[in-house]
Curated annotation (Swiss-Prot):
Gene source species: Xenopus laevis
Reported function: Phosphatidylinositol-4-phosphate-binding protein that may play a role in the process of vesicle budding at the Golgi and anterograde transport to the plasma membrane.
Family, as annotated: Belongs to the GOLPH3/VPS74 family.
Lineage: Eukaryota, Metazoa, Chordata, Craniata, Vertebrata
Protein's cellular compartments: Golgi apparatus, Golgi stack membrane; Golgi apparatus, trans-Golgi network membrane
Entry membrane topology: Peripheral membrane protein
Residues covered by region (Beta-hairpin required for oligomerization): 171-182
Protein name (Swiss-Prot/TrEMBL): Golgi phosphoprotein 3-like A
Gene label: golph3l-a
Amino acid sequence: MTTLIRRGRRAEEGQERRADSEDSIKDKDEEESADSKDIRLTLMEEVLLLGLKDKEGYTSFWNDCISSGLRGGILIELFLRGRVVLEPATIRKKRLIDKKVLLKSDKLTGDVLLDETIKHMKATEPAETVQSWIELLTGETWNPFKLQYQLRNVRERIAKNLVEKGILTTEKQNFLLFDMTTHPVTNTTEKQRLVKKLQESLLERWVNDPHRMDKRTLSLLVLAHSSDVLENAFSSLSDEKYDMAMNRSKELLELDPDTEGMKPNACEMIWAVLSAFNKS
C-alpha cells in the first residue's frame, strides 16, 4: 500500500512538473510571439489601414486625430513587446495618467518607428508619462528643447511598410496646385480580415469583458476609436448590427481606465493610453 502511495505521489509530482514546464514554455512563446513573423501588422499599420480610403489611398483630410492615435499605438506596441512598462502605483501616483513610462528593455525590434522611440526613451531623464510621450512624439510641445522627440513623416513611413508587405501600392495624384503621394489598397483581403476581426469582437465573439478579449484586438479598438477610424470598420454592417457594434464599443470605451487598469491581468498600457486620450 505504501509503495502504491509513493508511486502515485511520484506520478502526481511528475505531472505537476510537466504542467509547470508546459506553462513556462507557453508563457515564453507568448512573450516571443510579439516579435515573431506571425504578427504580420503592427498596431500602427492596422490603424492606418483602417483609416485609408481604399481607392484614393489617403486618410480623410478632416481627420486630425489619427496622428496622436498612431503615437498611442507605438506605446502599446512597445508594451506588448516587453520593451516598456508603467511605474508601480504609489500613494501619490495611483492614476494611470500620472504614472511614468519606464524602459524595460532597449533591445531593438527591427521596426524603425518603435526603435526610434526606444532610443528617445533611453536618452530621456526623468521619465515621462503616457500623455507626455504622445504629445512629444506628435510634436505638440511648447518646449523647444523637446522638439527633437517628434517622430516625422509617420504616416508615410507606415504606408511604406505596408507597401513592402504587399498591402498598399504607391501612386502620384494631382490635386489642382500640387502633387501628392497616395497609397491605394491592393491587398483588400488583408483589410477585410482586419475589419472582420473588429466586427466579430463586438458581435459574434462579444464577451462583455475587456479582460477576456485578445489584447491586440482590445488595443486596436481603443486606438481606432482614438484615431476616429473605428466607424470605418462598421460601414458594411446592416443598420441593426451597426447600432449594436457602436453601442458595445461605446460601452467598452466609456469604462473607467483607472478601475480597469487595477484589475487582475489587466494590460495597463492600453488603459493608460485610453486615459490619456480621454484627458486630451
